[in-house]
């Protein structure tokens, strides 16, 4: 009885539980039968915050493999939201996570250990039964214990590089144009190889620019950072943070092994237009416009890197395969819910 009760409550491990991860926690907690949520954090000071949100914190650092020993066999669903290190050609963090998840789990104590032992006894008994009875006994073992774990990886649409404003679906070959995107491609390939070995069932979600009330370019507008003139401007793609959390969970539930899905809304606008719409909604001045040549002289390399890539993501898989309904189909839909005299107007 104890084993059945425990095995019926699945565990979800969130690796990299920042803003989007916390939104995933909130959405999981709202389910009629919420899972047990475990959050890996490298910051001991965040334990109280995670507990208050409804997650069990585990302190560990993807840059220190020795701190990850508890992850082996811990959960059947993993949300991998941690970014790569800010340097290097590959993603050592994803490599460390795959190794930790595939390690033999430490002996469980208490009810969890009893559950594992109960399943083991059931399997041992089934091995001595006639074929028909053995098959029926095997079906009693929860399906999650017979399949590899599911891992949903939060990647980036930056892996495509510059596409000249073309419409891009998930079948387009990756052509990363900067070191950040190269590291993301490394992570995706590591997860695909792990999937081919049967170590896990990876679903890859490629994410564009994330926005929310607390993630808008307000500081950029107040600094007066310029945008490109329309003739030189690039198409950008967007997703609200709440929708993104929902998409990650939908990928876990309905996604296909090894499949890529774009987490992008229906917005079709250039970068400068995005800044102008946020400026109007928040009661701030529109950014000045400059040519690309002027931008190359005046802006920082990181800012320029985003201005060198133009693409329009196709989100057909999101709607057809994941059957996901966007809460905010476009940036404009979100901005219409706020005004300059409400929360946006007070942001700094």
Label for each model-derived stretch:
Residues 164-204:
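Catalytic helix-loop patch of NAD(P)-dependent Rossmann-fold dehydrogenases
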Residues 247-303, 348:
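Mid/C-terminal beta-alpha module of Rossmann-like enzyme folds, strongest
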Residues 42-102, 111-116, 120, 125-132, ...:
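NAD(P)H-binding glycine-rich loop region in Rossmannoid oxidoreductase-like domains
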Residues 192-236:
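NAD(P)-dependent short-chain dehydrogenase/reductase
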Residues 329-348:
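Amphipathic terminal alpha-helices
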Residues 99-122, 126-179:
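Conserved Rossmann-fold NAD(P)-dependent oxidoreductase catalytic core, especially the SDR/UDP-sugar
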Residues 296-325:
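Conserved C-terminal active-site "lid" loop/helix of NAD(P)H-dependent oxidoreductases
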Residues 185, 197-198, 210-222, 250-261, ...:
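Glycine/proline-rich active-site loop of Rossmann-fold NAD(P)-dependent oxidoreductases
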């Amino acid at each position: 009885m104890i084993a059945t009760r425990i095995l019926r409550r699945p565990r979800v491990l969130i690796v990299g539980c920042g803003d989007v991860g916390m939104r995933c926690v909130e959405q999981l907690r709202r389910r009629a039968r919420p899972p047990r949520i475990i959050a890996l954090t490298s910051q001991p000071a965040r334990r109280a915050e995670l507990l208050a949100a409804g997650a069990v914190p585990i302190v560990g650092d993807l840059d220190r493999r020795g701190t990850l020993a508890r992850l082996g066999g811990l959960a059947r669903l993993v949300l991998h939201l941690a970014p790569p290190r800010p340097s290097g050609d590959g993603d050592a963090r994803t490599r460390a996570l795959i190794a930790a998840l595939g390690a033999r789990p430490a002996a469980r104590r208490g009810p969890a250990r009893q559950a594992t032992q109960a399943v083991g006894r059931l399997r041992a008994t089934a091995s001595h039964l006639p074929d028909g009875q053995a098959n029926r006994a095997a079906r009693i073992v929860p399906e999650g214990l017979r399949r590899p774990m599911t891992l949903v990886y939060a990647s980036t649409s930056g892996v495509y590089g510059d596409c000249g404003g073309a419409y891009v679906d998930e079948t387009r070959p990756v052509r990363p144009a900067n070191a950040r995107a190269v590291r993301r491609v490394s992570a995706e390939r590591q997860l695909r190889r792990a999937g081919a070995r049967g170590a896990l069932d990876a679903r890859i979600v490629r994410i564009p620019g994330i926005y929310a009330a607390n993630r808008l370019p307000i500081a950029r507008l107040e600094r007066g950072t310029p945008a490109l003139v329309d003739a030189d401007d690039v198409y950008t793609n967007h997703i609200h943070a709440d929708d993104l959390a929902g998409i990650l969970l939908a990928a876990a539930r309905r996604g296909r092994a090894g499949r890529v899905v774009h987490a992008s809304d229906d917005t079709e606008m250039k970068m400068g237009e995005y800044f102008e719409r946020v400026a109007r909604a928040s009661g701030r001045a529109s950014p000045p416009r400059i040519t690309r040549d002027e931008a190359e002289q005046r802006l920082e390399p990181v800012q320029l890197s985003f201005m060198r890539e133009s693409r329009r993501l196709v989100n057909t898989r999101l709607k057809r395969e994941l059957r996901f309904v966007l809460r905010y189909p476009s940036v404009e839909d979100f901005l219409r819910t706020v005004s300059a005299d409400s929360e946006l107007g007070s942001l700094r």
